Amino acid sequence: MHQPAEVARALVALQGVGRDFDVSKPWLNRVVERAPRQLLTAVDDFSLEVRSGETVALVGESGCGKSTVARLIVGLYPPSRGRIEFDGTPQTAPASGIWSEGVRRRMQMIFQDPYASLNPRWRVTDIVAEPLRVQGSLARRADLQARVSELLTQVGLSAADGEKYPHEFSGGQRQRISIARALSSTPEFLICDEPTSALDVSVQAQILNLMKELQERLRLTYLFISHNLAVVSQMATRVGVMYLGRLVELADAAALFSRPRHPYTRMLLDAIPDLDMSGRPRTPVAGEVANPLAPPAGCAFHPRCPLANQRCRAERPKLSPAQGTLVACHAVEERRG
């Protein structure tokens, strides 16, 4: 299990962050049908700190809000409510999600699909150098070329690869190019949005090893988003479990994988194949995620939870300490499971 050299300050802090999307019908349809506007809450009351040097992973089923949190942090989406800070500095224009130029240089994002995130009409040199050109940090072309060659070598490619186009590379090599581009502005914080999910298993291991080496060498901080708990177990210092836009459990990786507290976390871990054939009882993930346009009252997980009671159906649980972890669950609080 990966551990940082030391636990330091909170580099990124989210406090009560929420994000709503307007999914209403067109205005004329609403007038004719006398229908109200409709909002979809993708993230709700989300609070998290990412400390310098660590890797925090966010896990959960598709549609739980993991990628929305990533886009809120980098400013691709403005938050509907709440506060986001980077190293103590809030967004300069929270309503539009804008960071100051100095903050933008210190955070970058690695996207999920290396086939879609690279411009097929650009050479690799231009792709990697784009952030440097935008920031104007290297004016001379010779300096720019030297920096690109250094970055490509750093991620396991050759300087000569800079003259090629993305279609000449495999999926794993394309993701290395994406990592080189993310590192070009010398960031401290990288958001990794399922960076290995589109890759073969053998290539996944190579990319994960590269990311761990770069973290140790460059003292990087990661927010690692994934639905693959086997990958998360190799990368994470702490793990946050999301369900329907809310954080339901946050714990050190070792504690979460050895003793999960929330029923949803247990179900996710039980879905991992048991290669040891231990014969331990397993609870499969039952049912489907609720409709986010009409979430259930109380705990959003109660329709799928074997431990749910009347309180779960009526009262939304808050994230509270429970034996060294943070859990939002009435059953854990009442020691029913």
Where are these regions (language model features)?
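Conserved catalytic motifs of ABC-family nucleotide-binding domains
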Residues: 186
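Conserved ABC transporter NBD signature motif
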Residues: 82-93, 103
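Conserved ABC ATPase signature
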Residues: 165-169, 173
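Helix-to-loop junction immediately C-terminal to a conserved catalytic motif
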Residues: 74
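Conserved ABC ATPase "signature" region
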Residues: 142-160, 269-270
